[in-house]
């Protein structure tokens, strides 16, 4: 039997639903709305296996903040009513047949990436439900990303139109441009247009840095900020080697009647 694993980027979905509620303390409304959303996802994607991955809620910002202290330093904390309601949300999702993977320190992005790549590398179909374009670096013939809220696939043509690079170059792209929302600086003075030009000519940051024909307008920037670019690429890249502690059989989807 062919496998179709659906991975829900849980807080990505929950926070978007919660943020548009008129009453942020009404967690029952959050539960109802997310359950309705998940039922639509189940009906549309028809998974054989499914799991919702949650970030940890500790003050520790993970390994990325260790190598780049400013990483996500200014990110707004989760609203307290939502934080207190997460257990109830997870229970409601469990009753729909969707188990939750709760991180005890790793970022959800890395957990999602590890599971998705592991299954896709075996030739099975994987769909990640998220608006996070960071997952697009994982794109492959059997791995796809669905932006449920915009009703679109974050696929290779989308990435080429949005960024002008290949999916496998996205970490290099963000290493150059930075990611302002996560306080990732990149190389000062190199924006999207320049990054596209550089990565159209060279496959990655290191090749560009070592190239004798790197245009003069970029040479000084690279020489002065190459270490920043390397660190920013590192934190932009997803880890795919985390020990998950479970197997596919544990997350087989069985429709609840």
Swiss-Prot record:
InterPro entries: 5-3_exonucl_a-hlix_arch_N, 5-3_exonuclease, 5-3_exonuclease_C_sf, DNA_polI_H3TH, FEN, HhH2, PIN-like_dom_sf, Xni. GO terms for biological process: DNA replication, Okazaki fragment processing. Residues 189-194 are annotated as: Interaction with DNA. Its cofactor is Mg(2+); K(+). Keywords: DNA-binding, Endonuclease, Hydrolase, Magnesium, Metal-binding, Nuclease, Potassium. Transmembrane segments: none annotated. The keyword Lipid metabolism does not apply. Signal peptide: none annotated. Residues 165-254 form the 5'-3' exonuclease domain. GO terms for molecular function: 5'-3' exonuclease activity; 5'-flap endonuclease activity; DNA binding; magnesium ion binding; potassium ion binding. Mg(2+) binds at residue 109. SUPFAM superfamilies: 5' to 3' exonuclease, C-terminal subdomain, PIN domain-like. Its EC number is 3.1.-.-. It is an enzyme of class 3 (hydrolase). Belongs to the Xni family. Has flap endonuclease activity. During DNA replication, flap endonucleases cleave the 5'-overhanging flap structure that is generated by displacement synthesis when DNA polymerase encounters the 5'-end of a downstream Okazaki fragment. This is Flap endonuclease Xni. It comes from Vibrio atlanticus (strain LGP32). The lineage of its organism: Bacteria, Pseudomonadati, Pseudomonadota, Gammaproteobacteria, Vibrionales.
């Amino acid at each position: 039997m062919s496998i179709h694993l659906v991975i829900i980027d849980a807080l990505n979905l929950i926070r978007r639903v919660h943020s548009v509620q008129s009453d942020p303390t009404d967690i029952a409304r959050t539960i109802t709305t997310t359950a309705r959303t998940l039922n639509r996802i189940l009906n549309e994607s028809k998974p054989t296996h499914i799991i919702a991955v949650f970030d940890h809620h500790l003050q520790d910002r993970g390994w990325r903040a260790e190598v780049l202290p400013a990483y996500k330093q200014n990110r707004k904390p989760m609203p307290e009513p939502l934080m207190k309601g997460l257990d109830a949300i997870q229970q409601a999702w469990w009753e729909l047949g969707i188990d939750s993977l709760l991180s005890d320190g790793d970022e959800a992005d890395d957990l999602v990436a590890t599971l998705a790549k592991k299954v896709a590398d075996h030739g099975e179909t994987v769909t990640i439900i998220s608006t996070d374009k960071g997952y697009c670096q994982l794109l492959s013939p059997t791995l796809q990303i669905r932006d449920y809220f915009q009703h679109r696939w974050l696929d290779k043509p989308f990435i080429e139109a949005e960024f002008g690079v290949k999916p496998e170059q996205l970490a290099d792209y963000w290493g150059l441009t930075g990611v302002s929302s996560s306080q990732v600086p990149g190389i000062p003075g190199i924006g999207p247009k320049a990054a596209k030009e550089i990565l159209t000519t060279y496959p990655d940051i290191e090749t560009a840095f070592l190239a004798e024909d790197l245009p003069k307008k970029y040479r000084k920037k690279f020489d002065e900020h190459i270490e920043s670019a390397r660190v920013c690429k590192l934190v932009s890249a997803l880890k795919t080697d985390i020990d998950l502690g479970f197997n596919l059989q544990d997350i087989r989807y069985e429709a609840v009647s």
